[in-house]
Swiss-Prot record:
The chain crosses the membrane at residues 391-411, 415-435. It catalyses: 2 (2E,6E)-farnesyl diphosphate + NADH + H(+) = squalene + 2 diphosphate + NAD(+); 2 (2E,6E)-farnesyl diphosphate + NADPH + H(+) = squalene + 2 diphosphate + NADP(+); 2 (2E,6E,10E)-geranylgeranyl diphosphate + NADPH + H(+) = all-trans-lycopaoctaene + 2 diphosphate + NADP(+). The keyword Transferase applies. Its main location: membrane. CDD domains: Trans_IPPS_HH. Its cofactor is Mg(2+). Its EC number is 2.5.1.148, 2.5.1.21. One of its GO terms (cellular component) is endoplasmic reticulum membrane. It is found in: Membrane. It comes from Botryococcus braunii (Green alga). GO terms for biological process: farnesyl diphosphate metabolic process; sterol biosynthetic process. SUPFAM superfamilies: Terpenoid synthases. This is Lycopaoctaene synthase. GO terms for molecular function: metal ion binding; squalene synthase [NAD(P)H] activity.
Length: 444
């Protein structure tokens, strides 16, 4: 984290402090059960952002979601380990789900924290086996489908067509969204129509996965002992003979054209995916779904027409991430932020990328997202208005009246400046003000 970022973005200071505190609490949760404790500690190691997202969910969904995520990450670790021979990896992926009932099964593979995940996988299995039959069935079914889908793509040296690209993203991300929707419904916290609209959950998953694939070009192409190539040849073949040509600085112009083409492809999932939000009713589930989506569109805005994709890592500022977590509390706040980032991408299209041959289609898709957001904002504002003034607004009014009364009292007593204010009065006013801000933003 660059502390100088706060000079340019002071509005991110308080959200960052709140996120740091929430992260501290998360790391220091008192969990007596060793298997459950391992799962949450491992989750925090492999994905701090998703660990925070899970904490937004209702309590009864957190353990299942945590274990579901770790099982799929373990499956993904097998797929990603390029040192495992194909003849070993393919059957391993196809039978991975069968080991969910075996408390002793584990395998050595992966790197970094994933080595620990695979070495201690029996602890994940132990928690999984305690779930009710319905939860276990959902997790096992998605793991089976995902593993078989991954195996189908192992024999392909590269993704050739856009439909293949969509199918791969469905297997590795869309299925996860579909499974989560089933868990939401099975818990009784969401309605059956959420499961009936599988394609909407799938589209949201495709959008997030394509964000990662576009952003991680350099990491994937430099993977040893063999590169991982997920960009479809149907797109990159228009700009190069080999996918790895884009990492060569002399090919940057072509690389940028391909990058913008990839972003434009990812945008086609936005507008459809946004429609699924109308099917979510539980506020905690809604927030857990909203946060990754708004972070996804922000990432897409950052990578669009950005040469740094081919030089290193492009990611959001930590303060910006914190601000999204803190302020994304409702559909209204979500659509306002989503629209803000869509507007930023539109500006990129109209200025720095105006000569890109794909820009007309990019603009069309961005403007479709903008229109969907504006319509949703109007609808959400009407709904919020019908509820009457919020607690935060009432408190803000009360604070204003109290502050005016206090200053009037000090003035009548002969005070002429802040120096005349009793120190305890200043402290009280500031403390109440901070409490009001905290209530308005809601707890992370």
């Amino acid at each position: 984290m660059k502390y100088t970022d706060f000079l340019a973005h002071p509005d991110e200071i308080i959200p960052t402090i709140r996120m740091m505190y929430a992260d501290y609490r998360l790391k220091n949760m008192e969990i007596k059960d060793p298997s459950v404790r391992f799962c949450y500690n491992m989750l925090n190691r492999v994905s701090r952002s998703f660990a925070m997202v899970i904490q937004q969910l209702p309590v009864e969904l957190r353990d299942a979601t945590c274990v579901f995520y770790l099982i799929l990450r373990a499956l993904d670790t097998v797929e990603d380990d390029m040192a495992i021979p194909k003849e070993v990896k393919i059957p391993m992926l196809r039978t991975f789900h069968e080991h969910l009932s075996d408390r002793s099964w584990k395998i050595k593979c992966g790197y970094g924290p994933y080595v620990d995940l695979m070495d201690n996988y029996p602890l994940v299995t132990d928690v999984y086996l305690r779930f009710d039959e319905g939860t276990k069935a959902v997790i096992k079914d998605i793991t089976r489908r995902m593993g078989n889908g991954m195996a189908d793509f192992i024999d392909l040296d590269e993704v050739l067509t856009i439909p293949q690209y969509d199918l791969y993203c469905h297997y590795v991300a869309g299925l996860c969204g579909i499974g989560m929707c089933k868990l939401f419904v099975d818990s009784g916290l969401e309605k059956e129509d959420l499961v009936a609209e599988e394609d909407l959950a799938n589209q949201m998953g495709l959008f997030l996965q394509k964000n990662n694939i576009v952003r991680d070009y350099l990491e994937d192409i430099n993977e040893l002992p063999a590169p991982r190539m997920f960009w479809p040849k149907e797109i990159w073949g228009n700009y190069a003979k080999q996918l790895d040509e884009f990492k060569d600085p002399k090919n940057l112009d072509k690389a940028m054209l391909c990058l913008n083409h990839m972003v434009t492809d990812a945008l086609r999932h936005c507008e459809v995916g946004l429609r699924s939000l109308s099917l979510l009713h539980n506020p905690n589930i809604l927030r857990a779904v909203l946060i990754p989506q708004v972070m996804g569109v922000r990432t897409l805005t950052l990578v669009y027409n950005n040469p740094e994709v081919f030089r290193g890592v492009v990611k959001m500022r930590r303060g910006e991430t914190a601000k999204i977590f803190v302020t994304t509390t409702s559909k209204l706040s979500f659509f306002r932020t989503y629209l803000q980032f869509a507007n930023e991408m539109e500006q990129k299209c109209l200025t720095e990328a105006k000569n890109d041959p794909m820009v007309a289609l990019t603009l069309k898709r961005v403007q479709g997202v903008q229109a969907a957001c504006r319509a949703a904002i109007v609808k959400a504002e009407i709904a919020e208005g019908a509820k009457g003034p919020s607690t935060a607004m009432v408190l803000a009014g009360a604070l204003l009246i109290a502050a005016l009364a206090y200053f009037a009292y000090v003035y009548s007593a002969g005070g002429t400046s802040l120096k005349a204010l009793p120190l305890f009065g200043v402290v009280i006013i500031l403390a109440i003000g901070l409490f009001g801000r905290n209530l308005a933003l809601k707890t992370v």
